[in-house]
Amino acid sequence: ENQSLITIQLKLLPLPKSTQTMQNLTLLDGQKFQITIQRLCRQLIENHNDFSESVLIGIQPRGIYLAKRVAEELRKILPDNNIQQGDMDITFYRDDFRRRSAPLIPSETKMDFIIEGKKVVLMDDVLWSGRTIRAAMEAMLAYGRPQKVELLALVDRRYSRHLPIMPDYVGIEVDSIASQKVVVSWVETDGEDKVVLLSEVEK
């Protein structure tokens, strides 16, 4: 099993909308998805050892599935260790909160631990502009001052950043254009684990 970082490079030119339809390209199937999760867990263990001073926080709404999956896998590898994992909502910290025509509905924050002085690993399924992570950083500081903050992303859409934010742990890197969309499916909510790139192509 090859557990090296997967990089997908795509060079597709946008076409006129009137002649476009959507095409799916599977970046990670179920098997590669699981291998990627396991690799990320091994990388976390290298840096966090027994996790006695570390906590995992999934960013609502989709990052929580990644955080839960990583926590489950870590508990299998380290059954005698206390892996602390929580969910954090960032709705009121988004920079577009008051700019949207429709009101945003906040999700639930679940963190039954203290982050003060801890090493925090923020997790999200797709890293794109970086604005979600900026909001997460601000929201997190409302709960305390961590010793260190790291970022784990299942998918890193490189070259799409609006803010200077880079992940510490990456499952898969994707070079894509703005008209393309990365969709992460989870067996818990979608019936299967998969990462798909949606691209507009000529009919």
Regions found by a protein language model. Give the residues of each.
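PRPP-associated nucleotide enzymes
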Residues: L5-K203
